[in-house]
Amino acid sequence: MWLPKIRELIEAIKAIIKGPYTSKFPNQGHTPHPNFRGQPKFNEEKCVGCGGCKEVCPVEAIDYLDINDKLNPRRVITHYTDTCIFCGQCEAACIADCEGIKLSNDWELSFFDRNKANEQIEKELQLCEICNEVIACRDHLNWIIGRLGELSFSNPTLYLTRLKSLGIVDENIRSALAHQGCSDRSDRVKILCARCRRETTLTTTGTSKL
């Protein structure tokens, strides 16, 4: 009958000598294991704005909004921490070598204001030079160019995007028939969406004298 009490006394003496078994949080910060899956965080420099993370998120914790402004077209990508389940699918699906968004070791995620739980980044959009529709983020186009290499020169949208990033494209180039509200075949050498690319390829406007 006394044996259990003796064991308790032995454990109490060990605790006095060696210290408590529990962690000293919150007096001392906790360092999680390196493989701990904490809050995902965007890397604005690595992210290309493709939206792949949004497509694979099982709880729709990632969303984006395209702001089609001619002066400052941009894509606002938002991660909702309060909805996230930290599954890691966004990191696994990232086309930028899984560097655009990564799980961190941040685990203490208490907020008094729910809006502060959201993380946002902005990526510059590339618009069609005729209809101003969204084509993709410029970083995404540059990523595609890097993957295709010299094959990208078969696509005017890609190689003109590359030349524009190098600062050697004249921004003042306009269609010779722009005042007539139509597209000319010369517009093929522009950054265009798929619909305008088709129209400028199939149009016969301005070619009757050839």
Place the predicted regions along the sequence by residue.
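Phosphate/diphosphate ligand-binding glycine-rich loop within oxidoreductases
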Residues: 75
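Non-ligating segments of multi-cofactor redox enzymes
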Residues: 1-68, 72, 81-83, 89-92, ...
